[in-house]
Amino acid sequence: MPSSGPGDTSISSLEREDDRKEGEEQEENRGKEERQEPSATARKVGRPGRKRKHPPVESSDTPKDPAVTTKSQPTAQDSGPSDLLPNGDLEKRSEPQPEEGSPAAGQKGGAPAEGEGTETPPEASRAVENGCCVTKEGRGASAGEGKEQKQTNIESMKMEGSRGRLRGGLGWESSLRQRPMPRLTFQAGDPYYISKRKRDEWLARWKREAEKKAKVIAVMNAVEESQASGESQKVEEASPPAVQQPTDPASPTVATTPEPVGADAGDKNATKAADDEPEYEDGRGFGIGELVWGKLRGFSWWPGRIVSWWMTGRSRAAEGTRWVMWFGDGKFSVVCVEKLMPLSSFCSAFHQATYNKQPMYRKAIYEVLQVASSRAGKLFPACHDSDESDTGKAVEVQNKQMIEWALGGFQPSGPKGLEPPEEEKNPYKEVYTDMWVEPEAAAYAPPPPAKKPRKSTTEKPKVKEIIDERTRERLVYEVRQKCRNIEDICISCGSLNVTLEHPLFIGGMCQNCKNCFLECAYQYDDDGYQSYCTICCGGREVLMCGNNNCCRCFCVECVDLLVGPGAAQAAIKEDPWNCYMCGHKGTYGLLRRREDWPSRLQMFFANNHDQEFDPPKVYPPVPAEKRKPIRVLSLFDGIATGLLVLKDLGIQVDRYIASEVCEDSITVGMVRHQGKIMYVGDVRSVTQKHIQEWGPFDLVIGGSPCNDLSIVNPARKGLYEGTGRLFFEFYRLLHDARPKEGDDRPFFWLFENVVAMGVSDKRDISRFLESNPVMIDAKEVSAAHRARYFWGNLPGMNRPLASTVNDKLELQECLEHGRIAKFSKVRTITTRSNSIKQGKDQHFPVFMNEKEDILWCTEMERVFGFPVHYTDVSNMSRLARQRLLGRSWSVPVIRHLFAPLKEYFACV
């Protein structure tokens, strides 16, 4: 069979007819050989990146006359299996499976098995050039000619792969086949950076699609039922035969338009289909009721249970995703199936370090293993009737036994024993934690308790209360009915184990919520707002205050519960919305702001003493004639903020030894202090011998890197890994620099780090330093928010922070001439460039020449209290200078802490 190129279009019709007749026998023989070859060969040839569905092969049920379509006159009657698409591609349509024994039975979709694109008739070349298989025969051809036409179409499709590789070689723009559309990916779940408006749009679109699909299914069901009743006069549940499926648009036996259905029947069927439509039927597993492990960003693998969308009160999950109800807190999330594992993968998903540190994770493990043991019929010893401390120990022992059972593979039943029973597979069964967890699950609490709750005098409760959103709703309802005092319940979670008062609003707070508040109160997102709700330090959806100088958030759950039903929607419609902390009124339903909340908030962080230490040694002031210059050891020195403040206070500095590894920071210190700083390199290379050689020291200061301590960093490694371990270098050198026994000379030290650190890390630092920290926010003495913890023995660290006349408290005071501040104070400036942007709309803080502008480096230096151009050395870029400032201390705060040292050391 002669091959033809793109230019062989002048051959006459008679010659093409002779060629086809001469090669007909060869093609039939070749077809027999091709049917014996495996169909996988066809998949390996041609363009790998594009999957094409070949024209369907006629079966015995379809008419024998081929339907031919021309490019200029497409009609409904002449449309064939390969209708022309605008981009020249073949329309992808499903075709009936060829019967056994038909010529195409051995091939998938009628595609050739080998020799693709080797020899092509001239008419096939022209047809493919036009983007469709076209022949010269009309629709009145005989059955024999139909077979020849089929062979010609198959041959034309053979050379499609080789032609496709040539097409577009000079550029996609000159090709008939246009550039494919870019693939759009969709990340399932609710990432924190998706705005509420976009999330609502997605949910509304999913809901519309689900309703539309339900209506179509209802109509099709009605059509099938009417057809079945007309044929057999009885209801048949079997599916209709394959020939009646609308897969072949050219088949005259298929009705393409559904018969009219009554309005009542249509509505009834639509409602029934919307309720009874199967859920999670995408063939990817993880059905309703299954126990799974789920992965969210920033969290370890967490145990959960697959639930129906009906339980969540939201819309259906998209295809390939599942609604998961998490154990421990009972919240819901949409998780893609790639981020799910069965509970039987306990050995690979269970994280021992998280179990040791996080009480909520321990509670979640306890709850899921309770459910697993109940399903598997595995019995564990129950908690005995005793006081609460013994109950907690019994729960601890039981939890350990269940974990060992899970790590052993859930024997003897194995993973099969974890399958949900039939009643839990019902999507409309309300299954909450307190219904499918044994009552002992509520007894679990992280031992030892910080403070024992009050015990009832009438009887000893066997277990603690079950705390969830419904518990808080019930207690708040009792408060509204004047049956309970709001100070007796934790307004954050609903617990009755109140240990202190909420620092901002009238109401109580439990120990767990106190720990969360300590961690999250000063944790901010990239938009400058709090990461969590001001009331409960949680919340799935939060309302952000519209006041530019306020950075607080309130979750919808707390607002609707404490302020009143519908208050959240009213706040959303109000623009701008002033939150309950900066509003004019002090009372909003049950949410009443405390009048003295600023001092209470300060005392909340100052008196959060989980551990009691002996008060630091108090040194009496040194007489003026006996005062000597100070000798300082500065670890993690940065840009020499300590030396700058000592000079500003007029304190004479005898020696300033600094440990720093950043070259830019060292350059700034050397240039601005004229070589008076002795740099000693990495803090890990400093030994006790060096301390004795350089000392004695009167003041040791430092602040280790906070990257692995701040809970803002989801990949943080904690105090004992990464840069967190550098704290122990400070502790080691502080111990070496302390005066010997019998030496009563004044000795002071100061250690600084972020407020947004884990409670356990803060507790460990305090235990090593044998001191509790004080929290100081630079917003009281500067134009920027910057809350930090300070440990030390400096005199008067707890005294109120007072500004001076030289402090620039407003951003406008820090700007150059002709520039207008849009905010009175800026958010915490960090090493990241986007920390300059302010508010939920990410505005730049300065307005100049009718345009928004960023802070200049000189203005940032004024915000931190540094002299103008303090970091302007060695041609450093703006970002490099911002990184230096983002790691530094606030000068007014350090001046406030160092001021009492004037009573002990010589001054100029």
From Swiss-Prot:
Q: Where is it found, in Gene Ontology cellular component terms?
A: catalytic complex; chromosome, centromeric region; cytoplasm; euchromatin; heterochromatin; nuclear matrix; nucleoplasm; nucleus
Keywords recorded for this protein, A-Z: Chromatin regulator, Chromosome, Cytoplasm, DNA-binding, Isopeptide bond, Metal-binding, Methylation, Methyltransferase, Nucleus, Phosphoprotein, Repressor, S-adenosyl-L-methionine, Transcription, Transcription regulation, Transferase, Ubl conjugation, Zinc, Zinc-finger
SAM-dependent MTase C5-type domain ranges (all copies)? 630-908
SMART domains per record: PWWP (SM00293)
Region described as Disordered? 1-183, 226-281, 443-462
Catalytic reactions of this protein:
a 2'-deoxycytidine in DNA + S-adenosyl-L-methionine = a 5-methyl-2'-deoxycytidine in DNA + S-adenosyl-L-homocysteine + H(+); L-cysteinyl-[protein] + S-adenosyl-L-methionine = S-methyl-L-cysteinyl-[protein] + S-adenosyl-L-homocysteine + H(+)
Phosphoserine, modified sites: 102, 239, 251, 386, 389
- Modified residue annotations for S-methylcysteine: 706
* Location in or out of the cell: Nucleus; Chromosome; Cytoplasm
Region Interaction with the PRC2/EED-EZH2 complex, residue ranges: 490-582
ADD domain boundaries: 478-610
Q: Where are the zinc fingers (PHD-type)?
A: 530-586
Q: How is its activity regulated?
A: Activated by binding to the regulatory factor DNMT3L. Auto-methylation at Cys-706 in absence of DNA inactivates the DNA methyltransferase activity.
Q: Where is the PWWP domain?
A: 257-315
Q: What is its main location?
A: nucleus
Q: Give the protein's function.
A: Required for genome-wide de novo methylation and is essential for the establishment of DNA methylation patterns during development. DNA methylation is coordinated with methylation of histones. It modifies DNA in a non-processive manner and also methylates non-CpG sites. May preferentially methylate DNA linker between 2 nucleosomal cores and is inhibited by histone H1. Plays a role in paternal and maternal imprinting. Required for methylation of most imprinted loci in germ cells. Acts as a transcriptional corepressor for ZBTB18.
Summarize the subunit comment. Answer: Heterotetramer composed of 1 DNMT3A homodimer and 2 DNMT3L subunits (DNMT3L-DNMT3A-DNMT3A-DNMT3L). Interacts with DNMT1 and DNMT3B. Interacts with MPHOSPH8. Interacts with histone H3 that is not methylated at 'Lys-4' (H3K4). Binds the ZBTB18 transcriptional repressor. Interacts with SETDB1. Associates with HDAC1 through its ADD domain. Interacts with UHRF1. Interacts with the PRC2/EED-EZH2 complex. Interacts with UBC9, PIAS1 and PIAS2. Interacts with SPOCD1.
Q: What is this protein called?
A: DNA (cytosine-5)-methyltransferase 3A
- Upper lineage: Eukaryota, Metazoa, Chordata, Craniata, Vertebrata
